[in-house]
Curated annotation (Swiss-Prot):
Organism: Borreliella burgdorferi (strain ATCC 35210 / DSM 4680 / CIP 102532 / B31) (Borrelia burgdorferi)
Gene3D superfamilies in alphabetical order: 3.40.1280.10
Superkingdom of origin organism: Bacteria
EC number(s) stated in the UniProt entry for this protein: 2.1.1.193
InterPro entries the record matches: Alpha/beta_knot_MTases (IPR029028), PUA-like_sf (IPR015947), RsmE (IPR006700), RsmE_MTase_dom (IPR046886), RsmE_PUA-like (IPR046887), tRNA_m1G_MTases_N (IPR029026)
Compartments (UniProt record): Cytoplasm
Catalytic activity: uridine(1498) in 16S rRNA + S-adenosyl-L-methionine = N(3)-methyluridine(1498) in 16S rRNA + S-adenosyl-L-homocysteine + H(+)
PANTHER family found in the cross-reference section: 16S RRNA (URACIL(1498)-N(3))-METHYLTRANSFERASE, RIBOSOMAL RNA SMALL SUBUNIT METHYLTRANSFERASE E
GO CC terms in record: cytoplasm
Gene this protein is translated from: rsmE2
Keywords carried by this UniProt record: Cytoplasm, Methyltransferase, rRNA processing, S-adenosyl-L-methionine, Transferase
Lineage, highest ranks first: Bacteria, Pseudomonadati, Spirochaetota, Spirochaetia, Spirochaetales
Enzyme class: transferase
Family membership: Belongs to the RNA methyltransferase RsmE family.
The name this protein goes by in its record: Ribosomal RNA small subunit methyltransferase E 2
Length: 243
């Protein structure tokens, strides 16, 4: 574990008080941390604190802050729009995209999704997915805490056409080159379909909206593999673009 992830309500001046029973158990009983030990603490969407344990009580840990690194906004934010996946595949995908780094995760019930999420009864999934995201942040040391959203289809999402350039992963698309220009946009949206690909109505919709259709110089990928590959591909392109 490279860091723990906490909310801002754990702050007490220059100190951080950890009262969460699971975190307490892991740090005290599993990792055997003691007074004087150091640990990085990520406060969601705020800062990373290099901290030191000053007191361990029967049900709390008190940290003092040695250094504060503010979380700077990236030059580009990446949002992914992925179809709901069957079984535990979505858990693995979430863990890996968080480790790579993504600003927003949108899970959509595509027309051809084999497994669909009940949007009106998603509280249990939200809780489970949030735990997966936190665990991935702890293990990877990534500072980007992504938002997660659920939608019933691709047609009525709150797309941001003025600030975001959207790319649809599809076999009919163009292969992106290192010369791809991302000028005038601060966000990238990557749209990946289900195992059965997009429906005809979804493809027509994306074309009407002027989205960019792209493909990758690879064999046909499973949906879960395509999500990871697409995100890593765009991250590499953006790093080259930003020098």
């Amino acid at each position: 574990m490279k860091q723990i992830v906490l909310d801002e309500n754990c702050l007490a001046g220059n100190f951080i008080i950890v009262k969460d029973a699971k975190i307490y158990h892991h740090l005290v009983n599993v990792r055997r941390l003691k007074k004087g030990d150091k640990l990085n603490i990520l406060l969601k969407d705020k800062e990373l604190r290099a901290s030191e344990i000053v007191k361990i009580g029967s049900n709390f840990i008190k940290f003092t802050t040695n250094k504060i690194d503010k979380i700077e906004k990236n030059n580009f934010e990446i949002s992914i729009f992925i179809s709901s996946l069957k079984g535990r595949k979505i858990d693995l995908v979430l863990r890996q995209v968080v480790e790579i780094g993504v600003s927003e995760i949108n899970i959509i019930n595509a027309d051809r999704s084999v497994s669909k999420i009940d949007i009106n009864n998603a509280s249990a999934k939200i809780l489970r997915f949030s735990k997966i995201i936190d665990e991935a942040l702890k293990q990877s040391g990534n500072k980007i805490v992504p938002k997660i959203n659920f939608y019933n289809n691709f047609f009525y999402l709150p797309y941001s056409f003025c600030t975001t350039r959207y790319y649809v992963a599809h076999p009919s698309g163009m292969i992106l080159s290192k010369n791809e220009s991302f000028d005038n946009f601060g966000k990238i949206g990557i749209i990946i379909g289900p195992e059965g690909c997009f429906s005809e109505s979804e493809i027509v919709f994306f074309k009407e909206k002027g989205f960019n259709f792209v493909r990758f110089n690879t064999p046909i990928l499973r949906a879960d593999t395509a999500i990871i590959y697409s995100l890593a591909y765009f991250k590499a392109l953006l790093e080259d673009y930003n020098g």
